[in-house]
């Protein structure tokens, strides 16, 4: 319908979302990021590429200021619960749904934050830790179920899947997915399903 959202770039903790088709194109770990010079920092240059990050117990953060995800983010309430269980809720000094802002605040020494791995740049000098168990979040495109896509929306799907962290095989999957989706919508419209 006119004025309704039909498609969105969407981070999520799960891929089965009511009323949506979710086209997942990337998994990434949610990492604890510490500012430069934090007492729990380590020499990040010694971390080997492709190897797991060190693991930290959040309770070790003590009185470290925490930058939290806003509740409207896909993982905001879960992150708040994790901080709460570690006794760190009183340390939360700021919340935002703008992840690059949280990263910049860590970079500028304001506090620690849980941020998706794709934002991390080792050259920035901040330290990252995994949690145990690891927390995986998904990046993808949410489409309103049964809604026929415009050419512009199809183009955006191709653009995102070909350029935003997707493994190479996902580049070809975009064509297949869109073709199969059209067949499902056509079959539904003609009561074949």
Locations of regions flagged by a protein language model:
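Hydrophobic hinge/microswitch elements
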Residues: 1-4, 11, 72-127, 186-192
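Alpha-helix C-terminal capping/helix-to-coil transition sites in glycosyltransferase folds
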Residues: 2-4, 27, 63
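Short beta-strand elements of ligand-binding domains
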Residues: 7-13, 35, 69-70
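Beta-alpha-beta core module
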Residues: 17-23, 28, 53-56, 100-147
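Secondary-structure junction motif
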Residues: 34, 42-86, 150-153, 164-177
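Active-site-adjacent beta-strand anchor residues
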Residues: 68-69, 95, 142
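A late-sequence structural motif
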Residues: 127-180
């Amino acid at each position: 319908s006119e004025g309704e959202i039909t498609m969105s770039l969407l981070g999520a903790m799960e891929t089965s979302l009511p009323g949506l088709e979710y086209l997942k194109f990337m998994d990434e770990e949610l990492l604890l990021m510490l500012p430069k010079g934090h007492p729990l920092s380590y020499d990040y240059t010694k971390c080997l590429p492709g190897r797991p990050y060190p693991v930290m117990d959040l309770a070790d953060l003590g009185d470290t200021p925490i930058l939290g995800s806003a509740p409207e983010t896909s993982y905001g309430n879960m992150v708040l619960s994790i901080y709460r269980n570690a006794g760190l809720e009183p340390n939360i000094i700021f919340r935002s749904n703008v992840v690059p802002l949280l990263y910049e605040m860590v970079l500028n020494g304001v506090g620690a934050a849980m941020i998706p791995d794709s934002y991390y740049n080792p050259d920035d000098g901040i330290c990252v830790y995994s949690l145990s168990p690891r927390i995986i979040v998904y990046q993808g495109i949410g489409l309103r179920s049964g809604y026929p896509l415009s050419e512009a929306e199809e183009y955006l799907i191709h653009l995102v899947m070909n350029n935003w962290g997707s493994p190479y095989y996902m580049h070809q999957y975009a064509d297949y997915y869109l073709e199969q989706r059209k067949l499902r919508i056509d079959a539904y419209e003609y009561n074949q399903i």
